[in-house]
């Protein structure tokens, strides 16, 4: 969790339980972000909320603080067994569930409440053992939670707090039937504290809130512009044959501390990964079919700085807390306008600055007008000198090789050809977007 000081509202002035305040203070959290300052006073009165806030705004800490505080101030149901959860936090992806659990650890330590994870792609037996040790707060994805429920590992009769994170993404991924299945097996909405968070409060999200929450108050934190003002956006129009060389030239020029390269398909991500790995970059691959253990390892390496570049599909565009991402490269412009916002939102988080570089190539330039209409501004265009691009690129590594390369080495020599691009034209923001034929 990233320390921020965005409002003058202090956690210490909210009337939280001392154990909760202690956990926050030990991690250095003193002031609330806007979503925390708006949501927590409402939640601490026992009022449900449907919150609209994008990733990177501090919403995870908001609902964790409210959940832990609610369980400390609300007597548990009479006759409850230690294996029966009192709170449930549902996330659309296992990576997000893991991140929520990690963010909860300071509060787990300070309050003594027990939390457990339940998500697919990892050993059922290991998670079962954790649940059988006792659980107050269950964090996970709906599929594995339902698996445990149907095996009668626990019931949902004692639920006193519910969080649905990234609700719009739940719809996108087709999990809404699972969500309704779980909601219908919990106590009535008025008997529990309900929290829903979504990047957009669309009609279908509001309908879900109306159906399974008790008179929720809408809390909206929407920036004046959909893309953060701390993010420098830039657009290139590469030909298909220049696209990979341009990416590698820009990486050589920018030399980002931590970058994410987004492509639209698994196959394209593997291709980009192969080229970057062959060129000696410390690069990881994150797509939907990468085994869970390897996904966790790659994310850990990326977060620690052992991997500099992460090549990913949109599976990584939402929900993941990856601090200090300096650059986002949209190798492919996304088909969904909202995905553009979520992708570049990986950088420029919590007050930091960031740089987003997008390619409007021959295949995906058609997506640009809709994206610019959605973000309500044109993206500044830069030109490049094709003759200055890196020419001597090695053949890409195929996927039989490991997905994460070892630390990059410097031989001290120079490579032949135009290895260091010279004479690239200065980047000039456009006056208006050029038309694509």
Curated annotation (Swiss-Prot):
Protein EC: 3.6.4.13
Residue numbers spanned by region Disordered: 397-437
Positions with a binding annotation for ATP: 53-60
One Pfam family cited in the UniProt record for this chain: DEAD
GO biological process: RNA catabolic process
Catalytic activity: ATP + H2O = ADP + phosphate + H(+)
Residue ranges of domain Helicase C-terminal in the record: 245-390
Localisation per UniProt entry: Cytoplasm
Motif segment (DEAD box): 165-168
Keywords carried by this UniProt record: ATP-binding, Cytoplasm, Helicase, Hydrolase, Nucleotide-binding, RNA-binding
GO CC list: cytosol
Keyword flag Hydrolase: yes
Record flagged with keyword tRNA processing: no
UniProt GO molecular function: ATP binding; ATP hydrolysis activity; RNA binding; RNA helicase activity
Subunit structure: Component of the RNA degradosome, which is a multiprotein complex involved in RNA processing and mRNA degradation.
Protein family (similarity comment): Belongs to the DEAD box helicase family. RhlB subfamily.
Protein name: ATP-dependent RNA helicase RhlB
Gene that produces this protein: rhlB
């Amino acid at each position: 969790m990233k320390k921020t000081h965005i409002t003058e509202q202090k956690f210490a002035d909210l009337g939280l339980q001392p154990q909760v305040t202690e956990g926050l203070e030990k991690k250095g959290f003193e002031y609330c972000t806007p979503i925390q300052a708006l949501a927590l006073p409402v939640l601490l009165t026992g009022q449900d909320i449907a919150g609209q806030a994008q990733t990177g705004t501090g919403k995870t800490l908001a609902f964790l603080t409210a959940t832990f505080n609610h369980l400390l101030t609300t007597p548990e149901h009479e006759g409850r067994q230690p294996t029966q959860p009192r709170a449930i936090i549902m996330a659309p992806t296992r990576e997000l569930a893991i991140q929520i659990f990690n963010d909860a650890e300071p509060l787990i330590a300070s309050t003594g409440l027990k939390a457990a994870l339940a998500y697919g792609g990892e050993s059922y037996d290991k998670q079962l053992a954790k649940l059988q040790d006792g659980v107050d707060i269950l964090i996970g994805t709906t599929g594995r939670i339902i698996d445990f429920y149907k095996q009668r590992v626990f019931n949902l009769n004692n639920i006193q707090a519910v969080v649905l994170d990234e609700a719009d993404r739940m719809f996108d991924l087709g999990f809404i039937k699972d969500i309704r299945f779980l909601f219908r097996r919990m106590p009535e909405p008025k008997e529990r504290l309900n929290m829903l968070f979504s990047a957009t409060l669309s009609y279908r999200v509001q309908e879900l809130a109306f159906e399974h929450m008790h008179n929720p108050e809408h809390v909206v934190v929407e920036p004046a512009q959909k893309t953060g003002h701390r993010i420098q956006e830039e657009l290139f129009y590469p030909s298909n044959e220049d696209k990979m060389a341009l990416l590698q030239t820009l990486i050589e020029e920018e030399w980002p501390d931590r970058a994410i390269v987004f492509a639209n398909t698994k196959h394209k991500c593997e291709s980009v990964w192969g080229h970057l790995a062959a060129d000696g970059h410390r690069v990881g691959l994150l797509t939907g079919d990468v085994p869970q253990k390897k996904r966790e390892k790659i994310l850990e390496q990326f977060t620690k700085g052992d991997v500099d570049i992460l090549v990913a599909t949109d599976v990584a565009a939402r929900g993941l807390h990856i601090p200090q991402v300096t650059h986002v490269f949209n190798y492919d412009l996304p088909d969904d306008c909202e995905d553009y916002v979520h992708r570049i939102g990986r950088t420029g988080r919590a007050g930091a600055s960031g740089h987003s570089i997008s390619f409007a190539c021959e295949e995906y330039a058609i997506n640009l007008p809709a994206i610019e209409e959605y973000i309500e501004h044109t993206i500044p265009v830069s030109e490049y000198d094709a003759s200055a691009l890196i020419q001597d690129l090695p053949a890409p590594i195929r996927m039989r090789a490991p997905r994460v390369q070892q630390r990059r080495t410097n031989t001290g020599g120079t490579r032949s050809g135009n290895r260091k691009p010279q004479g690239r034209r200065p980047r000039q923001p456009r006056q208006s977007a050029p038309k694509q034929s």
